[in-house]
């Protein structure tokens, strides 16, 4: 919930017109990924609070004792404990929607060829699940829990590698502008970030380390794998955002006067 709070705060700070944020919630547009995202965020937050309250007495007894001193708080915690399983199950569809909607939002932005891929939404979802599993491995206290989520993350990393390959193939088999967009990570300005920080450091090395950990060959570097997965998750999003914003359907340098472009750059504050 703390990470969700940080994310929602940064989203709010990024808004150009912060006073009008309420307008997201005056209507719901079925065909708008932005509308879906706004409503998903507002629904996920209270459900996640209920999920925390369902285990607060077992996980945070000191905090639970403070909540129990207030009658409504005690009643709410009792209710959450009674319906813990139902609350946990209700979180799943909203969590999946939260993980996938960013990629869907970007892929719907047809003006940017690098984003215009049907694989992007699933890639963001699987990457988010992988980084979540890695975070659990880092903070879990029980060995059995660490081992379980290491195995889950191993499967997710393999799925992520397959999705990355599909995205690259999709761009390579697309229009000329999609191929040009692909060049940004195939020898272009984002090649290093994509292939070194994301693919190698964020996927391949953790994959190898987790295989060695599960097989019992080497456990000395086991805790390095989830850290690298988190680095890779960030690198993926940074590269996708930067490369996508630079990709375009119009080749300005060849279709417009170079003198006019130079003058526009000089006048740009």
Where are these regions (language model features)?
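Alpha-helical transmembrane segments
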Residues: 1-4, 92-94
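Transmembrane-helix bundle segments that line or gate the permeation/cavity pathway
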Residues: 2-19, 37-62
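Membrane-interface interhelical loops and short amphipathic "cap" helices
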Residues: 15-35, 102-121, 170-191, 239-269
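The feature captures the catalytic groove of carbohydrate-active enzymes
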Residues: 23-27, 34-40, 123-136
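Long, contiguous internal "core" modules enriched in hydrophobic/ aromatic residues
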Residues: 47-218, 223-225, 231-233
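Membrane-water interface signatures at transmembrane helix termini and the short loops
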Residues: 135, 235-237, 243
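C-terminal accessory segment of soluble enzyme catalytic cores
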Residues: 227-228, 238
């Amino acid at each position: 919930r703390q990470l969700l709070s940080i994310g929602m705060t940064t989203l709010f700070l990024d808004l150009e017109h912060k006073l009008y944020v309420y307008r997201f919630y005056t209507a719901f547009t079925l065909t708008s990924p932005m509308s879906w995202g706004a409503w998903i965020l507002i629904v996920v937050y209270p459900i996640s609070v209920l999920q925390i309250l369902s285990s607060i007495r077992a996980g945070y007894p000191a905090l639970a004792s403070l909540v129990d001193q207030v009658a409504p708080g005690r009643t709410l915690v009792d209710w959450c404990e009674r319906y813990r399983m139902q609350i946990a199950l209700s979180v799943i569809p909203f969590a999946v929607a939260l993980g996938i909607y960013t990629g869907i939002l970007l892929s719907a932005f047809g003006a940017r060829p690098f984003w215009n891929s049907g694989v992007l939404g699933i890639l963001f979802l699987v990457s988010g699940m992988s980084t979540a599993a890695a975070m659990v491995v880092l903070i879990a206290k029980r060995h059995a829990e660490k081992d379980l989520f290491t195995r889950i993350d191993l499967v997710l990393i393999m799925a992520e590698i397959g999705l990355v390959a599909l995205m690259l193939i999709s761009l390579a088999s697309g229009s000329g502008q999609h191929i040009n967009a692909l060049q940004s990570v195939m020898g272009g300005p984002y090649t290093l970030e994509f292939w070194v920080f994301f693919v190698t450091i964020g996927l391949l090395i953790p994959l190898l380390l987790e295989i060695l950990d599960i097989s019992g060959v080497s456990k000395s570097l086991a805790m390095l794998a989830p850290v690298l997965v988190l680095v890779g998750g960030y690198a993926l999003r940074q590269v996708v955002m930067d490369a996508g914003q630079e990709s375009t359907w119009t080749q300005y340098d060849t279709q417009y006067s170079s003198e006019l472009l130079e003058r526009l750059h000089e006048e740009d504050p």
